[in-house]
Swiss-Prot record:
The lineage of its organism: Eukaryota, Metazoa, Ecdysozoa, Nematoda, Chromadorea. The keyword Lyase applies. It comes from Onchocerca volvulus. Pfam families: SAM_decarbox. This is S-adenosylmethionine decarboxylase proenzyme. Its EC number is 4.1.1.50. Its cofactor is pyruvate. GO terms for molecular function: adenosylmethionine decarboxylase activity. Belongs to the eukaryotic AdoMetDC family.
Amino acid sequence: MSTSTLSDGSLDEGTFAAEDVSGVIEDYFFEGAEKLLEIWFDKNQNGATSLRNIPYSELVSMLDIAQCRILHSKSNECMDSYVLSESSMFISDFRIILKTCGTTRLLHAIERILHIAKIYCNMDNVVSVFYSRKNFMHPEKQPYPHSSFETEVDYLEEHFAGGSAYCIGPQRQDRWFLYTMVTPQAVFPFPEHTLEILMNGLPEDVLSTFSPNVSKDGKDCRMKSAINTILPPDIVVHEELFSPCGYSLNGLIPHSDHYITIHVTPEPDFSYVSFETNQHTLNLCEQMLKVLEIFKPSKFLLTIFTNELSNEGKKMQKNLWDLKICGCRRTNLQFLELPTETLIYVQFERIKSAEQVTCKEVFDR
């Protein structure tokens, strides 16, 4: 096991990852890894209302710029959830989360987001920004500015001043990119944490479930894949089983702005699954292990952001730091201290001699 250092040096990811997909048919490829943008606005700004006041038609126009569209939505008293043609969007009073896969142009939507927040919500003071993604298998297929993290950072800096950019992971292996901007006005007086699991190299018997040939609809897919076992019992879900294959699920925890989102790219040559949540209902450690047991990835990375007020998040960070998984070896472990949060980042890969990824926790729950 080697632990590489966190670096904000070279941000060019190159095309090295394409070596892992030599069997891909050249005229068909889909980039499952998402671009993830989270923007917090100042809730104390004079006259500020709610981002949920933005008209639906304006959201549609904004997503047109990003080159994706809304398939369906659900709401509770705290948040609106949207399953998109390429991943997800969540909007609460002062935060928007936009997560898009494929060759979407997510960062091009920033200017429109800022514009409609000002027009419809009287908000023009951004207090916190997070943008992150895993390295792409084929960055050369991405539109500007997404073909390299360096150009993405330049683009972000055109809209948000004073940010920091990080590249975490070995130069010639899977890596994770993070851009953050936090102002002194960014105060979060409540427990906050976010867990993300990004998985590659899934077995074909797992992947086959996420197709209309095996599952008749999203609910059937959720039950056959056992995804239902990793969801809180009172969660409100909406989901999409795509044709010819693929799956997305958003879930809202009642009476809160907590969510779960899952996205599956099931083509064997470039399989990818993401799981993300900020839920406080279930034990995060147990949930993480169930996710890994369901999808059985050959490679995966985990991140957990937490602030000082989240005991569950801090506990999860400690557990990730000490985590050992039977059948896997840890290839990277990092800690990053940010102005309002801390981050633990860890990567694992399956040991080739192991028949499957068997997840056994060796830490206290």
